[in-house]
């Protein structure tokens, strides 16, 4: 397997965890390149379920090296909890296989406090549905060049000085603007230093580790979080995350040249879901939406929030293709559609008196489109036991073929269930 980027093509929750876990078998190093613990990957291995928020799911494969890149924002306490949980399940999480870029920025207690305070002070119409994990405020400090990086955890004097400088501003915001409680330098410093000794042994030069892997002839996978349409620049702004989720950030977020990337896999759920606020043209607030939500067990791995559900949106997918340039599609949760008499695919939008096939770029423009649907026959068959393309029902194959026609990208992997082996490989 060549060097590959795996990214979500919708609004996150596409099933990246399973596909990453599957493809990990053919690679040696897995790199997480953006986001923080505001995303969750769920992987089912035998009778054990693993939910990972920071650590790449490749850690579940013995002998694979997992790297957290400079584009990630790291909550050290969450990292330590995940390490402990995995260790309790006999997973090797030693620093030799799990490394963190020294350049990764650290989520501080005041970031989380600000995240929650801001959301609480917004009107219902302006709330973006933040997870309250401090992701956005941490990225803000990074861009303002006042952030704390992972390397600082090994330098207590520098860390304390940075905390002291940061709290001059953060306390003014927390107390003066939001009416909240202030934080002391000692309390923040002590909270971070309580976990720092467990994080510091994992610090490394991630770029050098990747280069060393390539020099040894090894294959590297770059694992994205969230989805294309939550991208800070290209998503449904302002209802987006705080990082670039598109494939191009695999390079910047891990410190490698884009010319080293060979394949890009877009993970596409067979229908569409979204968590939290924001436009969702194909959302179904009816029996079809309830069916997808209940059969698909659509609850967020990170927040536990019920996901909004709707029909597949090919306009959204074409935009994802344009932004990411995928070489392959991995189609997930196809089995959830079994039992529906008919399926709908949105192929265009009605917008401002005309028909468009590209998403509008005006702020909240997606909230004012009307989907144009194409209807296809569904199927009653249970496809969870299908292992080949030929064993799938004819309507299922037609649905997949239509996705390929609408996106111009081959569906190379088809997931028909949550288990690792419930995947049809069409020439990956």
From Swiss-Prot:
InterPro entries listed in its UniProt record: Adenylosuccin_syn_GTP-bd, Adenylosuccin_syn_Lys_AS, Adenylosuccinate_synth_dom1, Adenylosuccinate_synth_dom2, Adenylosuccinate_synth_dom3, Adenylosuccinate_synthetase, P-loop_NTPase
An annotated GO cellular component: cytoplasm
Gene3D superfamilies named in the record: Adenylosuccinate Synthetase, subunit A, domain 1 (3.40.440.10), Adenylosuccinate Synthetase, subunit A, domain 2 (1.10.300.10), Adenylosuccinate Synthetase, subunit A, domain 3 (3.90.170.10)
Catalytic site: 13 (proton acceptor), 41 (proton donor)
Positions bound to GTP: 12-18, 40-42, 307, 333-335, 415-417
EC number(s) on file: 6.3.4.4
Binding residues for substrate: 301-307
Quaternary data: Homodimer.
Catalytic class of the enzyme: ligase
Subcellular location: Cytoplasm
Binding-site residues, IMP: 13-16, 38-41, 131, 145, 226, 241, 305
Protein name per UniProt: Adenylosuccinate synthetase
Protein's UniProt keywords contain Ligase: yes
Chemical reaction(s) catalysed: IMP + L-aspartate + GTP = N(6)-(1,2-dicarboxyethyl)-AMP + GDP + phosphate + 2 H(+)
Keywords for this protein: Cytoplasm, GTP-binding, Ligase, Magnesium, Metal-binding, Nucleotide-binding, Purine biosynthesis
Record text on cofactor binding: Binds 1 Mg(2+) ion per subunit.
Keyword Disulfide bond tagged: no
Pathway: Purine metabolism; AMP biosynthesis via de novo pathway; AMP from IMP: step 1/2
Amino acids binding Mg(2+): 13, 40
Cofactors: Mg(2+)
One of the record's GO molecular function terms: magnesium ion binding
């Amino acid at each position: 397997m060549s060097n590959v980027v795996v990214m979500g093509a919708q609004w996150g929750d596409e099933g990246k965890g399973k596909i990453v876990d599957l493809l990990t078998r053919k690679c040696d190093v897995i790199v997480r390149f953006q986001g923080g613990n505001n995303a969750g990957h769920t992987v089912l291995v035998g009778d054990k379920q693993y939910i990972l928020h920071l650590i790449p799911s490749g850690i579940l494969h013995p002998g694979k090296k997992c790297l957290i890149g400079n584009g990630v924002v790291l909550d050290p306490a969450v990292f330590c909890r995940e390490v402990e949980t995995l260790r309790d399940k006999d997973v090797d999480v030693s620093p030799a296989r799990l490394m963190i870029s020294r350049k990764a920025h650290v989520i501080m207690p005041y970031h989380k406090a600000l995240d929650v305070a801001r959301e609480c002070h917004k009107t219902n119409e302006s709330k973006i549905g933040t997870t309250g994990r401090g992701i956005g405020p941490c990225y803000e400090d990074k861009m303002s060049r006042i952030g704390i990086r992972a390397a600082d955890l090994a330098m207590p004097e520098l860390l304390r000085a940075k905390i002291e400088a940061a709290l001059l501003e953060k306390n003014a915001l927390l107390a003066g603007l939001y009416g909240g409680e202030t934080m002391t330098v000692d309390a923040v410093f002590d909270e971070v230093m309580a976990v720092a000794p467990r994080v510091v042994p994992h610090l490394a030069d991630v770029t050098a580790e990747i280069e060393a892997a390539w020099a040894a002839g090894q294959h590297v996978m770059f694992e994205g979080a969230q989805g294309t349409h939550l991208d800070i620049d290209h998503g449904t702004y302002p209802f987006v995350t705080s990082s670039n989720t598109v494939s191009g950030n695999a390079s910047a977020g891990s410190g490698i040249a884009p010319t080293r990337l060979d394949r890009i896999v877009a993970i596409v759920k067979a229908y569409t879901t979204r968590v939290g606020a924001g436009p969702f043209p194909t959302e179904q607030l009816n029996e079809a939406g309830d069916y997808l939500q209940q059969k698909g067990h659509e609850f967020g791995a990170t927040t536990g929030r019920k996901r909004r559900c709707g029909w597949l949106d090919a306009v959204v997918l074409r935009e994802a293709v344009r932004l990411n340039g995928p070489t392959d599609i991995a189609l997930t949760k196809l089995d959830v559609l079994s039992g529906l008499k008919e399926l709908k695919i949105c192929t265009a939008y009605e917008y401002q008196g005309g028909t468009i096939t590209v998403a509008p770029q005006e702020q909240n423009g997606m909230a004012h489109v009307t989907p144009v649907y194409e209807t296809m026959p569904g199927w009653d068959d249970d496809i969870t036991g299908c292992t080949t393309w030929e064993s799938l029902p004819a309507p299922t194959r037609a649905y997949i073929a239509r996705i390929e026609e609408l996106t111009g990208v081959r569906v190379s992997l088809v997931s028909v269930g949550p288990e690792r082996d419930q995947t049809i490989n069409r020439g990956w």
